[in-house]
Amino acid sequence: MPSVKAIENNELKELLEQYKISFFSMEYFENDLIRNFDNNISLNDDNIDDIRKNVIGKNVILIAAGPSLENELVSLKAVLESNERQNICVICVGKISRKLLENKIKPDYIAVTDAKDSTRWQISGIEDCGIPLLYLSTAASNVVSSYTGKRYIAYQNGFEKAEKMAEIKKNTLFDTGGSVA
């Protein structure tokens, strides 16, 4: 989108670039998204709305992968071993869930969003760790179905089948922003 680069308004430019990423991602992965959605819906998992009571009023720590994670493990562990633990909800992305568990850090939830089957490695070996899995309705169904613990599905805006299902079931729709994080 060379013409977008000419736009001086940074907010508008960023909005258009995010739209482009979202649009092309949905178009490129459309068949995977539909297959994953259909497979995931057939699991009849509870909806993520059911965990609201476990999160409301708490400080939420979302742990994602990145270069600073290694430096923060000790601090994170200290916070989670403190008296404040009951006031904290920890959600981690699938990519680092095993690393946290290896470091004796137990998140409250593991979240997976990626539609690609190749992300199965993210939860390999921890499928029965006892931590509930939060997943987008279009997340890789091979990852979701292999997880033997409690699972909660989330429906996202921008995917028509998810929007319809959320409307039928009266569930919350989430804006995912076209990005994994």
Residue ranges and their predicted role:
Residues 1-87, 98-103, 107, 118-131, ...:
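N-terminal donor/sugar-recognition subdomains of glycan-related enzymes
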Residues 62-64, 134-136, 154:
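Short beta-strand segments
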Residues 91, 109-111, 134, 152:
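Hydrophobic/aromatic beta-strand patches that form the interior of the parallel beta-sheet core
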Residues 91-92, 114-118, 125, 172-180:
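Short, glycine/acidic-rich beta->alpha junctions
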Residues 94-97, 112-119, 136-140, 156-160:
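Short, acidic/turn-prone active-site loops that include or flank metal/cofactor-
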